[in-house]
Curated annotation (Swiss-Prot):
One Gene Ontology term, aspect cellular component: urease complex
Annotated EC: 3.5.1.5
Compartment list: Cytoplasm
Family in the record: Belongs to the urease beta subunit family.
Subunit (UniProt): Heterotrimer of UreA (gamma), UreB (beta) and UreC (alpha) subunits. Three heterotrimers associate to form the active enzyme.
The UniProt record lists the keyword Cytoplasm: yes
Protein name, UniProt field: Urease subunit beta
InterPro entries reported for this sequence: Urease_beta-like, Urease_betasu_sf, Urease_subunit
GTP-binding recorded as keyword: no
Gene giving rise to this polypeptide: ureB
Length: 101
C-alpha cells in the first residue's frame, strides 16, 4: 500500500440506491452555457434554465459528488433528481429558501 492510496472494493458502486427520483426536461434558454454541480439545490439554478421548478424544490442532481452537468445554449436534456438529505435546510444559492424545505 502507498500512503494515500485508495483501494476500492471490486464491482460496481451504486449511488443513491432506493432514493426517490424525479426526471425533468431542462432547456437552456440563455446565450451562455450553464453548469450545475452535484449538490446544488436544483430549483435555484440559473434563471436561464427552463423547467418545472416546483417539482425540483428540495432536489439535487442524481450524479456522483463533485461532478456537474453542463447545459449549452439552446440545449434541452433530461435530468434525474433526488431529494437533498440531512436536515433538509437550504441556505445561500439564490436565497429563495433560506431555511427548512
Amino acid at each position: 500500500m502507498i500512503p494515500g492510496e485508495i483501494i476500492a472494493a471490486s464491482g460496481d458502486i451504486e449511488l443513491n440506491v432506493g432514493a426517490p427520483t424525479v426526471t425533468l426536461e431542462v432547456s437552456n434558454t440563455g446565450d451562455r452555457p450553464v453548469q450545475v454541480g452535484s449538490h446544488y439545490h436544483f430549483a435555484e439554478t440559473n434563471g436561464g434554465l427552463s423547467f418545472d421548478r416546483d417539482k425540483a424544490r428540495g432536489m439535487r442532481l442524481d450524479i456522483p459528488a463533485g461532478t456537474a452537468v453542463r447545459f449549452e445554449p439552446g440545449q434541452t436534456r433530461s435530468v434525474t433528481l433526488i431529494p437533498l438529505s440531512g436536515k433538509r435546510e437550504v441556505y445561500g444559492f439564490r436565497q429563495q429558501v433560506m431555511g427548512k424545505l
